[in-house]
Amino acid sequence: MNKQSTQKLPHVTTRRLHDMKSEGEKISMLTAYDYTTARILDRAGVDVILVGDSASNVFAGHNTTLPITIDQMIYHARAVVRGVQAETSRAMVVIDMPFMSYQLSSEEALRNAGKIMKENECDAVKIEGGNVIVDTVKRITDVGIPVMGHLGLIPQSIYKFGSYKVRAREEQEAEELLRDAKLLEEAGAFALVLEKIPADLAAEVTASISIPTIGIGAGGACDGQVLVINDMLGLSTEFHPRFVRRYAELDRVIFDAVSRYVDDVRGGTFPGEDESY
């Protein structure tokens, strides 16, 4: 792909992701919360852009993902979708359903999933949890809304588990996770995020289901990988877990640029003749 091209390309669909799994082609996924970042990600060839409820952390500064609302998620999603449409329109856009937007009942979940899909032009929603949300996933997918599942470490349940440690190290929890993955596939989920679980378990799950797995801290055997954009760009200097590979150190780059700007303004060298009319 020409990284600088804005030529419209075939849009990534659920069928395309399934084909990528069957053909052994890895799936790339990153988060985005704004128009500008979404344009860059789509132009760079990212397959799936996740409008993550991690916006609660990295965009709004909360300690958890719980505070963000459905209307705030839709606000971010609209910006991301416009960014993708302004470039190649290739990337699939998936939106996290935030905390308490799907837990009350399947009907409430369907209503909120429909609201998300109707109020922007996204491609799918993502829901956290295992067997307790299987009926909800089926209810939503039965009306034609694609659902991506999420197993392992599920950040919306952080207060239940008490930490962000690796999940499913014990045999019982590993067996439950494998069973939940199969149940979610049967319920109609088109893909699963596997977060912070042992690599060998992720490999077993990936081999046991026909839908793609997207790993984050789950080893290299998953069908794809996802990271939070702020983490992989080095914008979150206080957060550097083992599973994150930093591809840039933008905190330092931005700090240096802003410092030079401040110095130029204070020193009277900006604006100069070239920046004046």
Curated annotation (Swiss-Prot):
Keywords: Cytoplasm, Magnesium, Metal-binding, Pantothenate biosynthesis, Transferase. One of its GO terms (molecular function) is magnesium ion binding. Its EC number is 2.1.2.11. Mg(2+) binds at D53, D96, E128. Catalyzes the reversible reaction in which hydroxymethyl group from 5,10-methylenetetrahydrofolate is transferred onto alpha-ketoisovalerate to form ketopantoate. InterPro entries: Pantoate_hydroxy_MeTrfase, Pyrv/PenolPyrv_kinase-like_dom, Pyrv_kinase-like_dom_sf. GO terms for biological process: pantothenate biosynthetic process. Pathway: Cofactor biosynthesis; (R)-pantothenate biosynthesis; (R)-pantoate from 3-methyl-2-oxobutanoate: step 1/2. It catalyses: 3-methyl-2-oxobutanoate + (6R)-5,10-methylene-5,6,7,8-tetrahydrofolate + H2O = 2-dehydropantoate + (6S)-5,6,7,8-tetrahydrofolate. 3-methyl-2-oxobutanoate binds at D53, S54, D96, K126. Its cofactor is Mg(2+). Pfam families: Pantoate_transf (PF02548). GO terms for cellular component: cytoplasm. It comes from Prosthecochloris aestuarii (strain DSM 271 / SK 413). Belongs to the PanB family. Coiled coil: none annotated. It is found in: Cytoplasm. Binds 1 Mg(2+) ion per subunit. This is 3-methyl-2-oxobutanoate hydroxymethyltransferase. The active site is at E195. Transmembrane segments: none annotated. The keyword Nucleotide-binding does not apply. Homodecamer; pentamer of dimers.
